[in-house]
Regions:
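Bacterial N-terminal signal peptides
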Residues: 7-16
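Aromatic, loop-rich ligand-recognition surfaces of beta-strand-rich domains
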Residues: 22-27, 33, 38, 58-126, ...
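Beta-strand-rich interaction surfaces with strong enrichment in secreted/lumenal proteins
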Residues: 72-77, 131, 144, 207-209, ...
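Short edge beta-strand/loop segments characteristic of extracellular beta-sandwich folds
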Residues: 87, 98-100, 220-224, 292
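Surface-exposed binding patches on compact interaction domains or structured appendages
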Residues: 181-203, 216, 223-289, 297-298
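Aromatic-lined carbohydrate-binding surfaces of glycoside hydrolases
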Residues: 291-292, 302-310, 316-517, 523-533, ...
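Catalytic domains of carbohydrate-active enzymes that cleave complex glycans
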Residues: 445-449, 456, 460-526, 598, ...
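Catalytic-core region of carbohydrate-active enzymes that cleave or remodel glycosidic bonds
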Residues: 538-619
């Protein structure tokens, strides 16, 4: 494990970095990625029950499947034949095994291997009874000739070159993949990689993609090895065209995919710029490649290479081919897609152990917020109430504007933190909208400071009551005056989250009465018909409630300067952005907005981190990854990159439509993007929808000049 910097995307520098082992830096749990279970190839023997014909001293069969290739850690049996029987938990298919006998000194073992479906009828699948090769640290790869399906495996050692010493097995591994020595690899789709799909055709090493200028495009690769390979390092070259044009190496960034807990399993989601990662015996490691195509890149075919290299000279090279099209994406600040991912500054402060809104806190927030701005984020999340979401976060949200009730009954409001934070967010590129949560907090409880005693007072105030109006009316008047002075009044929205129509209407009426220049924003989880007649300037609807009537209103709302988006949260189960969600689901969300004419997408949240997000992405009863998309570091994630990718696809479609280049094939592919069918679909079916839409976008882009 390595201490890494705070840059989101980093390049491992090839020159000047020595290959091989180095002293590890001390682990800092706030900065270093660590995995509860490093990814390993599927090995049916891992949880198997082992029995033996006998054992010497403490040299029992537990060593045979512990994943460690250590000569002195072996099962030993002095009496020949020495028999090891493996009972797997279920039937498995495999085509080869790799077996390590004791290799501390030159010894030759003769043996045969049998398989059985039921522990009664046995078939010999490998015969090495005439073996004359001594055992080595590389072990023997034993091919079975054809795929074998069995639940039981038996290894019988018939002879040893050291008389009287018996039989000794260090490790046994079976797999449907190649178990030959060395580092293996392949190019892979940009999807979740696990032990079931890690290995594959090693002849498929070349990554090929097409990209617009000013686009961020991705690829994925997987390397694996039967033996341990310490100090895997990554190097990507510049991409060059035959005419001498270049995409610099700084724009060609490989990162290791790290695994994090996602419920009862782990999922490869963290994109880690660590300088090196150790590959355990029988392990695999995905590598994620991101190419940011400069806006002024000349169209053409660009070539380069990604190399994954470990200690002892083991390496795999992956050729890279990127076709840069003539089409160009606007800069993110000019994207029309309305992205609203809520921020949580207190979570960042707690995780890093710094005082909220201290200079160090802002230093940590800046790369996070700039990355969000680089995806076209249109809102800054602020708070005007204590605990606007009650206690449903690991870290509480606090108010940025303390309310003080003076002894004479008047109110005072301190805008210092609010002003400082809004100015900071705008410098980072967030906005222009400022969303203020909330006049309708979950639980209806509001807080203020008693100016006479300094005590914090809390009281439940339901929207629509005289008491609610008496509390919020003075604030709204003063707040609007302050915002006018700052020049922010027209960009400020009083925001509510998933409140019913009665509370929403009452709150909107209160704002209109006391601060008519301010607007209303709300993500709603009730059918749109329930909110008829309520002036919602920014209206986000839960995807399951998006209906034809709602969609028909979008063009008119847009003409009136209003924003209409959709959101997902702890539901639906598909499509979504959970840690375990198939990667194409995040792309699907961006394409769904384009297909249905919606302005954009909202999600709770961007960095609402649980206690230890680099280790466990879950929080409370919600699905893993529900509360955040970016990891500490900051480190990107597969789901964040793919969500951003979907936003880019939506922007491409906007450009194509604006230039009358949207083809019938593109329109046809987008016609399939409906939630009701998607939630009942399979991951493979959604991936095919995404593939067809991407291809149609690419084909249409080729017509642009």
């Amino acid at each position: 494990m390595r201490r890494v910097g705070t840059c989101l995307v980093a390049v491992a520098i090839w020159g000047g970095v020595a290959w091989g082992a180095a002293e590890p830096a001390p682990l800092d749990w706030r900065k270093d990625t660590y995995e509860s279970d490093p990814p390993r190839l599927a090995n049916p023997l891992r949880d198997a029950t082992l029995s033996v014909s006998g054992q010497w001293s403490d040299r029992g069969p537990q060593y045979v499947t512990d994943g460690e290739i250590v000569a002195n850690n072996h099962w030993a049996c002095e009496q020949l034949p020495a028999v090891l029987t493996v009972a797997m938990r279920e039937k498995s298919a495999f085509s080869a095994c790799r077996i390590w006998f004791y290799f501390g000194e030159p010894r030759i073992y003769k043996f045969f291997i049998e398989a059985s479906p039921d522990n009664r009828s046995w078939t010999r699948i490998a015969d090495w009874t005439k073996n004359d090769r001594p055992a080595t640290a590389e072990g023997f790869v034993v091919a079975f000739g054809k795929e074998v399906e069995a639940q039981y495996l038996r290894v019988t050692i018939t002879d040893s070159s050291v008389r009287g010493a018996g039989g000794h097995i260090v490790e046994l591994m079976v797999s449907s993949a190649a178990l030959t020595p060395g580092l293996h690899g392949r190019q892979a789709p940009t999807d979740r990689i696990d032990d079931a799909n890690a290995t594959g055709d090693e002849s498929l090493k070349t990554w090929r993609a097409a990209a617009w200028r000013n686009e961020r495009v991705h690829g994925q690769f997987v390397v694996w090895s039967a033996e341990a390979v310490p100090q895997l390092r990554l190097r990507a070259t510049a991409l060059r065209s035959e005419k001498g044009a270049e995409i610099p190496a700084s724009a060609v960034v490989p990162r290791f995919v790290r695994y994090v807990r996602a419920g009862k399993k782990t999922a490869g989601d963290i994109l880690d710029p660590a300088p090196s990662v150790d590959l355990p015996a029988g392990g695999f490691r995905p590598v994620w490649l991101t190419v940011t195509v400069p806006a002024k890149t000349r169209p053409g075919l660009y070539r380069g290479c990604l190399t994954v290299k470990g200690a002892a000279g083991k390496e795999v090279a992956f050729p890279l081919e990127l076709e840069v099209l003539g089409a160009k994406l606007p800069d993110p600040e000019d994207w029309a897609f309305f992205l609203d991912l809520w921020q949580h500054p207190w979570a960042v402060a707690r995780y890093h152990g710094v005082a909220p809104f201290s200079p160090e806190h802002y230093r940590l927030l800046e790369p996070i917020y700039r990355e969000l701005a680089n995806a076209g984020q249109k809102t800054l999340t602020t708070t005007i109430a204590e605990l606007p979401w009650n206690h449903q976060n690991f870290d509480a949200y606090h108010t940025m504007i303390p309310h003080v009730k003076n002894a004479d009954g008047s109110w005072s409001f301190d805008y210092a933190l609010f002003d400082e934070y809004v100015a900071f967010g705008k410098r980072c590129g967030l906005g222009p909208q400022i969303h203020c949560y909330t006049m309708a907090p979950w639980g209806d409880r509001v807080y203020y400071i008693d100016g006479s005693t300094g005590d914090q007072i809390s009281v439940a105030l339901r929207p629509g009551t005289p008491e609610h109006e008496a509390y919020w009316g003075p604030f709204l008047k003063a707040f609007q005056r302050h915002l006018v002075k700052k020049g922010w009044a027209d960009d400020t929205y009083i925001a509510m989250d998933e409140r019913g129509p009665e509370d929403t209407r009452a709150t909107a009426d209160c704002v209109k009465k006391f601060a008519p220049r301010l607007k209303i924003a709300m993500p709603g989880n009730h059918p749109p018909s329930h909110f008829k007649g309520i002036a919602l300037d920014n209206y986000c609807q839960f995807i399951a409630h998006v209906d034809d009537a709602f969609l028909k209103e979008v063009p008119q709302r847009r003409a009136e300067g209003k924003v209409t988006t959709f959101y997902v949260c702890c539901g639906p189960s598909r499509p979504n952005t959970f840690t375990f969600s198939p990667a194409d689901e995040q792309v699907w969300l961006g394409l769904y907005a384009a297909a249905n004419g919606l302005d954009g997408f909202l999600r709770w949240a961007f960095v609402n981190w649980p206690r230890d997000p680099l280790f466990d992405s879950g929080f409370g009863p919600w699905p893993a990854g529900d509360t955040f998309l970016l990891y500490p570091g900051p480190r990107s994630s597969v789901r964040w990159e793919m969500l951003r990718d979907g936003i880019e696809e939506s922007e491409k479609i906007r450009v194509l439509r604006g230039r009358q280049a949207a083809s019938p094939a593109l329109d046809e592919s987008l016609s399939a993007f409906h939630f009701k069918s998607a939630e009942k679909s399979t991951g493979a079916a959604l991936s095919e929808q995404v593939r067809r839409a991407r291809q149609a976008v690419e084909d249409a882009a080729r017509t642009l000049r």
